[in-house]
């Protein structure tokens, strides 16, 4: 399990002895993976399916930072390779998701009242991302803090905070 937070500038890794049971998780003994050279307020994290690419959403830099990992899900083997500025659509990005093949990316956050869709011409390569459209959530009167899709991409789930 991997966690980022706005008060730190790193990715924290946890090991769970039982699948999907957070009561069995403990923080790994190694140092957290610093993303301070890319953003001081990481707010979201995602991986490609085999863990060889990690994406960290930066609330401060208003961008998506891409890392290549030579060994899947091993943060000690990751290095920064690209970023995508999303400030034109979301000035305080907090939530991110990809479709299953990495050709679509979705961003939501505090500043906008919408989910922004991007097409990636090369799967899981944010440098090839192009803004497509935005889906308004104004009628739900909240700010997006979490974003996920079901396995077939037909249902979108949002976590909202009302302020």
Residue ranges and their predicted role:
Residues 15-23, 68-76, 119-127:
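Short loop/turn segments immediately following beta-strands, especially the blade-tip
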Residues 29-35, 81-87, 132-138:
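A short beta-strand motif characteristic of beta-propeller blades
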Residues 49-50, 100-101, 151-152:
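Residue-level detector of Asp-centered blade-edge/turn motifs that repeat once per structural unit
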Residues 161-163:
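Conserved small/polar residues in nucleotide/adenosyl-binding loops
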